[in-house]
Amino acid sequence: MTMLVITLLALLGFHSAAAAQDQSVTTLLTSLETRDELKPLKTVVVARDGETIAEKGYRGHTPSESTNIKSASKSIVSALVGIAIDKGLLDGPEQKIAPLLKEDLPSQADPRINDITIGNLLSMQAGLGRMSGPNYGRWVSSRNWVRFALAQPFDDEPGGRMLYSTASTHLLSAILTKVGGKPTLALAREWLDPVEGFRIGAWERDPQGIYLGGNQMAMSARSLLAFGELYRNRGRTADGRQVVPADWVELSWQPRTASRFTGDGYGYGWFTRRIGDEDVYYAWGYGGQMLYSAVPEPDGGHDVG
């Protein structure tokens, strides 16, 4: 799946006429249907400068149908945190989380829990034991996901190496629910309502009713693209409304750590990679739920796929 994206971005390079590029992408998307290694592929949508230049569904799927975008939803939770900060509901990335979640802290908590910040959760540098991969099932089988996550032993110092954990984003969802006074889904639908074409469908909740930050969110490829377009425009909608603060988009795309699996940088809910001569920022979800944004030179176009 990664090679598919690299091929797409290469075709979307800025070396030939836009019309020729558009035709190349359409041809490529058609050819993907016959590739055995891409049989799980459901849909691909590619846009350039806000215009969809090619889209295709495979094996009966369509770009308008919802699917579980998995961890790509972490980028959406990051946007909600940025909006909450802009609204004064949160102080900023350096705000400590312990006072916000004091009811769920362990009775004999490691003192380092008082050092974890909002930014640490966003960049996967909380230091707490990971609740992803082989530990995920044990976590979501617990009676209280927030308390279970906060009770994990520290594997590193807060602000240390990247420890990718869906629990970190879930703690952000719990914090948003508390400071926003509404469920995270209600906040998302209210705050991101101005984004044309964006819609969250079903979304799993924990036993306390908190929406699962960072997983189990249903969305269509077109809707995910609409979110990508919002970030392409530095948080501004097509009609000029500033939904996500522009400086938050820049902060989110600034690498703070790196994946030990790929070496790609990681900011606030977004991965970063250099492909060819382009900086690429992407939301990643298990099973190939991907949103890529390629940022060229200032006088070039901007692709989202």
Language-model features, listed with the residues they occupy:
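Boundary at the C-terminal end of the N-terminal hydrophobic targeting segment
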Residues: A18-A20
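Catalytic-site signature segments of enzymes, centered on catalytic residues
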Residues: P63, S132-Q216
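Active-site helix/loop module of the DD-peptidase/beta-lactamase fold
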Residues: K87-A126, A151, G180-N215, M219
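Bacterial N-terminal signal peptides
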Residues: T2-G13
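A short, well-structured edge-of-sheet supersecondary motif
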Residues: L32-H61, L291-Y292, G300-H302
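Active-site Gly/Thr loop motif
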Residues: A246, E250-D303
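Active-site-proximal alpha-helical segments within enzyme catalytic domains
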Residues: S168-I175, N215-R236, Q289-G305
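Active-site SXXK
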Residues: G50, T67-P93, L121, L172-L176, ...
